[in-house]
A protein has these predicted regions:
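Generic structural motif
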Residues: 49, 83-87, 260
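Metabolite-binding pocket within alpha/beta catalytic cores that recognizes anionic/polar moieties
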Residues: 29, 35-45, 58-72
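Two-metal-ion RNase H-like nuclease active-site motif
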Residues: 44-54
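Long, contiguous domain-sized segments
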Residues: 1-44, 101-104, 108-334
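Acidic, metal-ligating active-site segments
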Residues: 54-96
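Short loop/turn segments at secondary-structure transitions that flank enzyme active sites
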Residues: 52-55, 72-77, 141-143, 187-190
């Protein structure tokens, strides 16, 4: 076992050395791709929205619980002046029972779409009812391919169309209200920048850690070269997807760069976003995420202990049918 672990470790170290050398070479070949950020003193109203999910499997249906929370941090002259929540600091979760026939490949999309239904819906309402300068989503601001159902029941397809419509409302409302719409992807596994630069197919964040200096951003690039070739972007509308841009920001030498997406007809807006995010993301050198996003994550999070009361009520209401509805794996006699 020790020999096997050593072999794996050596392979990883060798690969990492190669990745670092290639990353530095890419920087030398593309010096204009890395921009120094001039951080500004935080001032304004910055919002964040995140959602939490828990799912329970029964034989006859799937029960999904979702909570989404909006958080607004108001800064003045570099100091946090106030914190507000939408619709409240700890709203009750919403429950969704589904009894549609469901193939295994559509379990993930069903759960993700249900979360997005609440999360993006909350973001739209948050925009309409709160004065903001910028709104950040936890994650991408676009629907992902993994969220699109593969065939499946018509109810699932209707759910997908409802979510796509909410995304359209989100973009339209942000534009109407003059709010910058952006998303922070904490742990990006994509290779969009690698593809754009013709680099080896590494995950962007893995090689950018070596290529970027603290306080830098990458030059914003289009989210996709051909939005019409991606099913979910085509469903959303290529006119919207064509105005979504991507860059990475490195706020600390002890943490990886994180990905930022934003909606604008002018990619130069990315520099303004980075100027705000940089100082706010340097509170903790080992976890460079802006505090309003962290607060939204904490407020939206669902844990099974907090939902035990609701689940016990349901179990009691089902009575003798309870064991029938439980998945067989939960009834193992050993």
């Amino acid at each position: 076992v020790i020999e096997e672990v050593e072999r794996i470790a050596q392979r990883i170290l060798s690969r990492e050395t190669q990745r670092r050398e290639e990353a530095l070479a890419l920087r030398r070949q593309n010096p204009d791709f890395f921009l120094k950020i001039n951080p500004v003193v935080p001032s304004g109203r910055f919002g964040a929205v995140d959602g939490g999910l828990l799912a329970y499997e029964y034989m006859g249906f799937e029960l999904i619980a979702v909570r989404a929370v909006g958080v607004r941090y108001t800064y003045g002259a570099g100091h946090l002046a106030s914190v507000d929540y939408y619709p409240s600091p700890s709203p009750p979760p919403r429950f969704f029972p589904y009894d549609m026939p469901l193939e295994e490949e559509n379990v993930g999309p069903l759960r993700s779409l249900t979360r997005l239904l609440v999360e993006i819906g909350t973001a739209v309402d948050f925009l309409r009812n709160t004065d903001l300068d910028m709104l950040f989503l936890d994650g991408s601001i676009l629907p992902q391919l993994v969220d699109k159902p593969r065939g499946g029941d018509s109810e699932l397809k209707r759910l997908y169309r409802r979510v796509i419509d909410l995304y359209r409302q989100l973009f339209a409302t942000a534009k109407e209200r003059g709010v910058v719409l952006a998303g922070v992807v904490k742990d990006s596994k994509g290779s969009r920048l690698s593809t754009y630069l013709g680099a080896p197919p590494y995950r962007d964040a893995s090689w950018l850690h070596y290529a970027m200096e603290v306080g830098e951003m990458t030059r914003p690039i289009p989210y996709a070269d051909k939005p019409e070739d991606q099913a979910t972007l085509k469903d959303l509308g290529t006119d919207l997807a064509a105005h979504v841009w991507v860059f990475f920001l490195k706020a600390s030498d002890l943490d990886r760069p994180f990905r930022v997406e934003f909606y604008s007809e002018d990619p130069r807006l990315g520099e303004r976003i980075a100027e705000v995010l940089l100082p706010l993301s340097q509170v903790n050198r080992m976890y460079t995420i802006p505090p309003f996003l962290l607060e939204a994550d904490i407020r939206a999070r669902l844990v099974k202990q907090s939902l035990s009361y609701y689940k016990e009520l349901l179990d009691r209401r089902l009575g003798a049918m309870y064991n029938f509805f439980r998945m067989r794996g939960a009834n193992k006699p050993f």
